Every structure is written in structure tokens, then in C-alpha cells.
Design a protein with these regions (language model features):
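Electropositive
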Residues: 1-82
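N-terminal targeting pre-sequences for secretion and organelle import
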Residues: 87-118
Length: 118
């Protein structure tokens, strides 16, 4: 999902996308708002990790977040246009996530209402 604070990664994202950091920050806040609506603080979640893909380039932990109703928060974020699937974050479901990401883009879901890239 987009970043919610100015950081080195946001400056990299700004350079790659051509979108000003201030706008990327707004997109990040939109994604955060969606997460808080779907999974408010205190929600019990289950984290599932892949042994071969536990961290990303920045050594952040990667996991599938399973909600109490069994839905995957990662999938919901992508399907609703508040996160994107990137080849930079390999996982066993990458192809599926890229497909639903493209659908969200075509259907102008979430952030895609404002920009085709983020």
C-alpha cells in the first residue's frame, strides 16, 4: 500500500511514478482509512507468511493478513484499489494479485479513481 509518512521510500516512489510525494501521501492516507474501516484497531487477525518470501528489500516482514471472517486483507486492498501488486514483492499468489489489480485499475476502484498509477 502507499506510504503514510515522508520517507526515503516515498522519495523513491515519487521518482519512479512521477507523482508528487504530497499526492502519494494523500493516497497513503486513503489506503490507511480503508484498512481502518475493514480492520479497526483491536480486530483479531491471523498472519500467514511464506517461508521463501518473509521479508522485502527493505527487510520489512511480509505476510497475508487474514481477517476474522476469513477474507485476506491484502486481497481486499488490491481488489478495491488501495494497494497494487508488484513484481518487486514476490509471493505464490502474485499472478492472481496482478490480475485483480488490473481489474481494479480498469474499474477505477479506490485510488485508481484519481490516477492510473501510484
Amino acid at each position: 500500500a502507499p506510504e503514510v509518512s515522508f520517507s526515503r521510500k516515498m522519495r523513491e516512489d515519487e521518482a519512479k511514478s512521477g507523482i508528487p510525494a504530497s499526492l502519494l501521501l494523500q493516497y497513503g492516507m486513503m489506503s490507511l482509512d480503508y484498512v481502518l474501516r475493514v480492520c479497526p484497531p483491536g480486530t483479531r487477525i491471523t498472519l500467514l507468511t511464506e517461508l521463501d518470501n518473509r521479508t522485502d528489500f527493505w527487510l520489512r516482514d511480509l505476510a497475508y493478513i487474514i481477517l476474522p471472517n476469513g477474507e485476506c486483507l491484502n486481497e481486499l486492498l488490491i481488489r478495491n484499489g488501495f494497494a497494487k501488486a508488484s513484481h518487486s514483492y514476490h509471493c505464490i499468489h502474485l499472478h492472481y494479485f496482478q490480475e485483480i489489480c488490473r481489474l481494479a485499475q480498469l474499474e477505477k476502484q479506490g485510488i485508481y479513481q484519481f490516477s492510473n498509477i501510484f
